[in-house]
């Protein structure tokens, strides 16, 4: 909040209406680049995918925060989300099973680290067992046990949202997991 409209207009003109968020985003990119200097060939770069949706940012964000939405789109085509439980808060968990057409179950979990509505969710993603303990990918045992995952939601036009997902290796990833990723 700004004390006057003039103060807000000056801040907008300067390009800093979101406070220090832009600086912190640039610091994040710079620090990661600096930290990557001199790393071994086993240090992997993040895997990033973006897509723009013809839907408001608040709705796209909400589709990641409520089971009533997630059960309609989460997982590969032909897979049904079953037994979902969601505790959407930092430290909370989304635990679920994906059921294949033959009835097989594959469990997964997300442990939330940071939630900044409606712009960002940071979590640790992994396969799991039915109890919610970390598991291995059923078809790729060398796949990383955990991935740091960041979802960002950016309003790019009136009623449109650019969604980006970024997967990164955790510091504790083994050399085999790093090569697989």
Regions inferred by a protein language model and the residue ranges of each:
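Hydrophobic ligand-binding cavity/cleft-lining segments
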Residues: 37-81
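Intrinsic-disorder/low-complexity, polar/charged segments enriched in Ser/Thr/Lys/Arg/Asp/Glu/Gln
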Residues: 44-50, 57, 93, 107, ...
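A generic structural micro-feature
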Residues: 41-43, 88, 102-106, 140-145, ...
């Amino acid at each position: 909040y700004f004390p006057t409209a003039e103060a807000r207009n000056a801040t907008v003109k300067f390009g800093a209406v979101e406070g220090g968020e832009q600086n912190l985003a640039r610091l994040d990119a710079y620090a990661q680049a600096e930290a990557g200097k001199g790393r071994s060939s086993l240090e992997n770069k993040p895997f990033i995918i973006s897509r723009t949706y013809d839907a408001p940012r608040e709705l796209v964000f909400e589709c990641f925060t409520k089971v009533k939405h997630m059960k309609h789109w989460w997982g590969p085509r032909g897979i049904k989300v079953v037994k979902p439980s969601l505790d959407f808060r930092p430290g909370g968990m989304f635990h679920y099973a994906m059921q294949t057409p033959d009835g097989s179950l594959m469990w997964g979990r997300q442990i939330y680290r940071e939630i900044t509505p409606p712009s960002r969710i940071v979590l640790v993603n992994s396969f799991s067992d039915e109890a919610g303990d970390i598991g291995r990918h059923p078809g790729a045992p060398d796949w990383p046990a955990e991935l740091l995952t960041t979802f960002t939601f950016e309003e790019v036009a009136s009623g449109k949202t650019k969604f980006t997902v970024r997967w990164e290796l955790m510091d504790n990833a083994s050399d085999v997991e790093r090569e697989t990723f």
